[in-house]
């Protein structure tokens, strides 16, 4: 709920800007934040998965853990981002790996879920059916944690087991990048 409310406030703030540079700065910050939330957290999850698989076979040294870290981060970052030896121990600063293992996926999941909901909201506004979306959204908030997420998403015609759900969420990020690039 808080991330959806953030998006409402963010969109209002961006849309109220009359200066292209202000819009650009806001959009660039939001895109960076969204990419960090989705791409970075998935990379963290991949690290945890690889780490635990390797640990199931043998005890690992800090250097071996750092090797796994570098391998998974380079795979996520691609060739455009260069990581040096100073990046090797960074895994040690992420408390989730110790205190709440395998939790980081929730950040990426939550962000993509909200992005998909936001896209549905935008479509509802465009088709003048936003009152139905708002009613469903209020019911979602009222339900709190009493419904499983898959049941709750059905009210919005969303199914997280389908690739289209994830594409919808990622398309929002792509659209925001396009909007940012369109500001000359």
Language model features with spans:
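C-terminal, non-catalytic "cap/extension" segments appended to globular domains
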Residues: 4-8, 12-16, 20-21, 30, ...
């Amino acid at each position: 709920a808080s991330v959806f409310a953030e998006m409402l406030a963010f969109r209002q703030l961006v849309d109220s800007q009359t200066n292209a540079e202000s819009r650009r700065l806001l959009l660039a910050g939001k895109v960076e934040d969204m990419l960090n939330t989705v791409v970075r957290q998935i990379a963290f999850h991949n690290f945890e998965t690889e780490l635990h698989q390797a640990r199931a076979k043998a005890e690992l040294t800090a250097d071996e853990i750092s090797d796994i870290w570098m391998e998974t981060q380079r795979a996520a970052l691609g060739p455009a981002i260069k990581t040096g030896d100073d990046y090797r121990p960074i895994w040690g600063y992420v408390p989730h790996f110790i205190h709440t293992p395998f939790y980081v996926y929730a950040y990426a999941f939550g962000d993509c879920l909200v992005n998909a909901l936001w896209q549905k909201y935008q479509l509802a506004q465009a088709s003048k059916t936003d009152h139905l979306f708002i009613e469903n959204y209020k019911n979602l908030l009222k339900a709190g944690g009493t419904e499983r997420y898959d049941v709750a998403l059905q009210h919005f015609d969303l199914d997280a087991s389908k690739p289209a759900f994830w594409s919808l969420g990622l398309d929002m990020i792509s659209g925001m990048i396009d909007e940012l690039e369109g500001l000359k």
